[in-house]
């Protein structure tokens, strides 16, 4: 049977599918809107399945708070064009609204929530079929506390933060949410940094310090032998500098011998206590950079976040925070 433009327009408004898809679905369903919707839905599922192995690196990140509960969610897609589409953003917001209203704690709970004629996951699959892009939910995080605050960085739906405080403090909480967005801390304080992270960082610091000590000894020995360390710091430089006439084969052989001998001797006689002390200092610097309370407050520029909060209210504390971004950092 022939379908009318009014019917096509109605189905398009309901489904969000393209004009031709709506026309074909209505024709196949003999004008039955409900059957046409099911046809579009099944087609969308098939399209989504074909795209399941693609990378979804764009998307929309949103945050919402409701009293003592706040959440972040990201709906990912393949292109910036779809990510900025009003319907895509609206779907992300609808999913977040449902998640917050139901106080969902996990992404699996969110996916299973009822939405439309199916679940949230069904709604995402349907939208994937309509746009022809892979879509997936990601980054669902929540915080709970006496007072919560959210921040959507620059309002571009790419980076959001949420923070929970032990008491109401609108300005301070908002400042903390902005701090988290800008400085990307991994914990509130040192106690929150996993021991595995500390151990890995101290090992990196030890290895770096040892290398610096060895390199310094080699540099001194090369200069003493009349060789410019910059001319022999790699095989590539040795060859290129020889071609320029800056060093000879004899210089290269001598440099290699000095580098090998001095490196081995210095590495075998490094003062362990000094190495550990330097490494601990570097760990302290790392913890200052990654612990929220230890960071320099981005708005004050001189005081730490801990000091700024104490000035605002001595009893004010950060209970929890989360941060999610789609951008590589």
From Swiss-Prot:
Alphabetical UniProt keywords: Cytoplasm, Elongation factor, Protein biosynthesis
Keyword Mitochondrion found: no
Pfam family name, one: EF_TS
Chain's role: Associates with the EF-Tu.GDP complex and induces the exchange of GDP to GTP. It remains bound to the aminoacyl-tRNA.EF-Tu.GTP complex up to the GTP hydrolysis stage on the ribosome.
Keyword DNA repair: no
Disulphide linkage map: none
Protein name: Elongation factor Ts
Organism from which the protein derives: Phocaeicola vulgatus (strain ATCC 8482 / DSM 1447 / JCM 5826 / CCUG 4940 / NBRC 14291 / NCTC 11154) (Bacteroides vulgatus)
Subcellular location: Cytoplasm
InterPro entries: EF-Ts_dimer_sf (IPR036402), Transl_elong_EFTs/EF1B (IPR001816), Transl_elong_EFTs/EF1B_dimer (IPR014039), Transl_elong_Ts_CS (IPR018101), UBA-like_sf (IPR009060)
One Gene Ontology term, aspect cellular component: cytoplasm
Annotated segments matching region Involved in Mg(2+) ion dislocation from EF-Tu: 79-82
GO molecular function, one term: translation elongation factor activity
